């Protein structure tokens, strides 16, 4: 059990331009995905993760704190942005949650907001 004066950050789906090639973002980026799912994910860029850590560390916030972009994005929509909207949909995915969107209200209450939206980044072919 964590001490009462501790904080734990619960990150959603973290990504970056050099994300692992065997994760969905990397598979789509590298045009190696063979399917998509009907899941929705709260994609947070690693730069926003670092920003969240810097914001939260000096505060007195305790307990578990969800950290994400705060937006639920369908995996299929991300595939479309990567030009792979025609991939087959894998329906049966045991052990996967349908949606992992984070309630980022605690982070926003200390002045933090995420700034890198995955759909804008992919659409603009940017590497923040």
Q: At which residue positions do the language-model features occur?
A:
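Short, amphipathic alpha-helical "lid/cap" segments that border enzyme active or binding sites
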Residues: 24, 46-54, 119-123
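Amphipathic terminal alpha-helices
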Residues: 105, 117-128
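Short aromatic/basic micro-patch
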Residues: 8, 43, 72, 101-102, ...
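Glycine-rich Rossmann NAD(P)(H)-binding loop
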Residues: 14-17, 34-40, 65-73, 94-96, ...
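Mid/C-terminal beta-alpha module of Rossmann-like enzyme folds, strongest
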Residues: 50-52, 58-98, 103-104
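Generic structural signal for alpha-helix termini and adjacent loop/cap motifs
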Residues: 30, 56-59, 110, 128
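Amphipathic alpha-helical segment in the mid-to-C-terminal domain
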Residues: 21, 46, 75, 114-118
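NAD(P)-dependent short-chain dehydrogenase/reductase
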Residues: 1-42, 46-47
């Amino acid at each position: 059990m964590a001490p009462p004066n501790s904080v734990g950050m619960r990150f959603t789906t973290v990504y970056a331009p050099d994300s692992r090639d065997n994760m969905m973002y990397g598979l789509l980026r590298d045009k190696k995905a063979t399917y998509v799912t009907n899941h929705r994910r709260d994609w947070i860029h690693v730069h926003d993760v670092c920003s969240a850590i810097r914001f939260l560390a000096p505060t007195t916030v305790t307990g578990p704190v969800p950290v994400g972009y705060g937006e639920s994005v369908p995996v299929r929509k991300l595939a479309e942005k990567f030009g792979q909207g025609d991939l087959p949909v894998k329906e049966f995915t045991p052990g996967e949650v349908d949606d992992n969107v984070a309630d980022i209200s605690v982070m926003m209450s200390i002045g933090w907001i995420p700034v890198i939206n995955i759909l804008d980044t992919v659409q603009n072919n940017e590497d923040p």
